Amino acid sequence: MMADEGIHEPIIERNKRTKAEIRAKEAGTLAGLYVADLLIREWMPGARFTWTSAEGSRIDEGTCILAIEGCRHQILACERIILNILGRLSGIASNTFRWVSNFQIPLAATRKTAWGTLDKAAVGVGGGLTHRIHRADALMLKENDLASTAEEGDEGAVRVRKVLSDVQTESIGAFVTVEVRSLDEALAAAEAWAERMLEHEEGVRLNILLDNMGPELSRDAVLDIETRGLRQYVTLEASGNITFDDLESWRTSMVDVISTSALHRAAPPLDLTCIFEGV
């Protein structure tokens, strides 16, 4: 970010010191302070600053977030970068808070992020779940994984069952997720995993990701798995183009968690401004 502004080393004080404040122009949930704090410490030597609002706090229009004193050149060089960081991450946190406040089923981010872990951290600040931070956290078997792992000719429920039966315990991580797209695949996943847990006395739950199945079909999958006595071996996650306007239709879906990139990809930045003393 600093390189984008042509800045490649810490900015040395070279003119009169001045004071400025970063203020909110709208209400929201504040996030990204730790990132901006590091930027100021590393790139604005000699600057004195105080955070007047805390990470995760709900702020109102006009709230002062940061009071800073440094040379005018330092502040002018860094103000837009600081505003961009705080604006984007606070926007994600605010959007996530809006979703979470209107829904009872836990909501999770996806890995479709522009700023990677920073975006996921902002989702967490807003009250959402981060899901996996990176691939090594948990084993996730999506369509491409299933296609590349299964034997030639295997497809659908047969492919799901075979791949889950062959999963190596040491590669699992915190949990296992398998992506399914039909009732048959969901049931095959639950049955295969239950058989495996009973045979090997393993205690890892399978997370079945119901991809683009919609609320009604997802509910059918949950009920089918429950009816067959397999619910204790799995959790059920719904995902696929779920928007804020869709939430009402998911209230009775009975899934355990909903994941959507709309938490972070559809979040407008929180509107912030930097005001210099005397303005």
Spans of model-derived segments:
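Acidic/glycine-rich phosphate/pyrophosphate-binding loops and surrounding catalytic core
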Residues: 1-207, 219-220, 224, 233-238, ...
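Short secondary-structure boundary segments
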Residues: 212, 240, 262
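Hydrophobic pocket-lining residues within nucleotide cofactor-binding pockets
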Residues: 242, 263-264, 276
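Extended hydrophobic secondary-structure segments
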Residues: 209-215
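A ubiquitous, low-specificity "background" feature that marks scattered single residues
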Residues: 217-218, 277
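Active-site loop ensemble at the mouth of alpha/beta enzyme cores that anchors a bound cofactor
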Residues: 273-279
